[in-house]
Curated annotation (Swiss-Prot):
Family per similarity comment: Belongs to the SHMT family.
Cofactor requirement: pyridoxal 5'-phosphate
Designated name of the protein: Serine hydroxymethyltransferase
A Pfam family hit: SHMT
Any one GO molecular-function label of the UniProt entry: pyridoxal phosphate binding
Cited NCBIfam families: PRK00011.1
EC number(s) recorded for this UniProt protein: 2.1.2.1
Cellular component GO terms, alphabetical: cytosol
Species per Swiss-Prot/TrEMBL record: Orientia tsutsugamushi (strain Boryong)
Amino acids binding (6S)-5,6,7,8-tetrahydrofolate: 111, 115-117
Broad class of where this protein is predominantly found: cytoplasm
Purpose: Catalyzes the reversible interconversion of serine and glycine with tetrahydrofolate (THF) serving as the one-carbon carrier. This reaction serves as the major source of one-carbon groups required for the biosynthesis of purines, thymidylate, methionine, and other important biomolecules. Also exhibits THF-independent aldolase activity toward beta-hydroxyamino acids, producing glycine and aldehydes, via a retro-aldol mechanism.
GO biological process: glycine biosynthetic process from serine; tetrahydrofolate interconversion
Amino acid sequence: MCKEIYDLIAKELYRQQSTIELIASENFTSKAVMLAQGSILTNKYAEGYINKRYYGGCEFIDEVESMAIDRVKKLFKCNYANVQPHSGSQANQAVFLALLKPGDTILAMDLNSGGHLTHGAKPNISGKFFNAVHYCVNKDSYLIDYNEVEMLAQQHKPKLIIVGYSAYSRKINFATFKEIADKVGAYLLADIAHIAGLVATEYHSSPIPYAHIVTSTTHKTLRGPRGGLILSNDESISKKINSAVFPGMQGGPLMHVIAAKAIAFSEALMPQYKEYINQVMLNAKVLAKLLQDRGYNILTGGTDNHMLLVDLRGKNITGQEAEYLLDAAGITCNKQVMPFDTTSPTITSGIRLGTPACTTRGFKENEFITVGKYIADILDNIAIIKSAKKNEGITITEIEKSLNSVITRTKHHVQELCNCFPIYTN
């Protein structure tokens, strides 16, 4: 490996080791997953499917893909699986290609309410090729408004209804979505990219009995390599999906990644993985309560999964400011648009916090109480400084200078805590 790349990898390893990772979509894979992903399987082209390849020399590749498929079907208790999508976005695009025609109507959650770009957002290909209609959360509870979903479905008669989100902290009633889809003759797609680990361990109800098709990423709560996944119990739809993935969307599958997926699925079938997901959820609840007790507005009043959404509109703090200054203190999170947010997506009015990565490191409730205090201390000080300068205006850089002692002290405490929980030993 060249020195330049080696040095950058070393720096990134140090960053991951010495900071608190609270981005809900990130996690730390096992060494076994990384070993497979860095294996000689990357050398092999394998266009096509098991026993139906367009290249020779795929006998062992077929076994790898077969193993991944068998394991994920067991994990999610389904009949059909495609493990070839390179990402969750491409998994969703394959579903659109398989089931829709350009101009068809799709019904999905609005981006500001917690939906995903690939669910018909205007900048995304899904919003350019299809007529996207969006439902929102309830303005008072910030929960899914099932009545609005049904009303819009009856009004617009979508070909596809999408359920599953990137910023929603409560449980989803897949059965209700199935009833709505059936009333209007729509396909139902469940995108469980964020909650796949909870579904696999039965801490969240499974969409498999209700949705025509289920997509997911293989990282996030599944703790595997970055990649995509498509599941179904419908044989005819699964055949359409296979054709949409290859040759419709992709050429050769990434066999080194599929091997890593197989390992991650095997790890998720182990009893300790269920214990891990339970701890992820406990940690999220503890963090949400701590921040609530410190006066911060947690959307929906709490969480049922691995994430929480902190609405900072009442504190006169932007998501951009919170993300930047928490990062300066060694706490990594992401700014997040809030429901009915009027600020730019590059500014936002809140932050999203997730517990999977730090739980993988071994953090439990006590550690997350400590983390919550660090976060609240930083945010409290931002609010104080901005309040004192409210008539003059103040930049993030100026806030950072004023917070220098608090940031320095917090960063030191963060590093001490992280040193007690190494990501990888040896």
